Amino acid sequence: RVLFRSVIGAGPSGLTVAGDLAKLGYKVTVYEALHVAGGVLMYGIPEFRLPKDIVQHEVEGLKELGVDIECNMVIGKVLTVDELMNDYGFEAIYIASGAGLPRFMGIPGESLKGVYSANEYLTRVNLMKAYQPGSRTPIMKSRAVAVVGGGNVAMDAARCAKRLGAEQVYIVYRRGMAELPARKEEVEHAEEEGIIFKTLTNPVEVLGDENGCVKGMTCVEMELGEPDA
């Protein structure tokens, strides 16, 4: 008897589980909300860090194992979990929907034009190619860009902004260089590319012009204290 399994989400977790199940003899169908499989490997990590051909090669390898991947399938809207279980015959479902919701700082001016979450910015650059002429979702090109945060995602966003023509790109981080959560090599690459680090600096307001566009940011100087959550 063929045992049917479903995976919701074609990111790293979902694809890994799909491959493992296929090797164990299960018939696996993966449902992906976006138009391509790969999840954060496709929309989050820039091409200069992870060539998309590598991701596509891995996805094709899963298909050769017998894994079916259906894109543009938003489970909960196109199909429900109950329908997958009752109508489609899946006996188990692995939910790998990711953690894609952004978290903002809750300061004035966050709704101004030109303020992006890292997820939105990187998705527009990496997946939607919004920097190309004629894009239906064009990304704002700027001479100066500030990226708030000090992790690997912040480094990716800053380096993308530099490649899109920004003359000055700042990493704004509330603690010191030694406390940056990004990997050391990512910080070094950013420094080599001319990214400016403004540490012990915390934004308190995003400033806008008469057209509702970002024109600056008010920050306060911080003092290094005990680590918090």
Q: Where are the language model's segments positioned?
A:
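A Rossmann-like FAD-binding core segment of flavoenzymes
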Residues: 53-103, 129-135, 163-229
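Gly/Ala-rich phosphate-binding loop of Rossmann-like dinucleotide-binding domains
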Residues: 18, 22-23, 42, 158, ...
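Short, small-residue-biased leader/transition segments that mark boundaries at the very start
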Residues: 2-3
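Glycine-rich FAD pyrophosphate-binding loop
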Residues: 26-42, 170-178
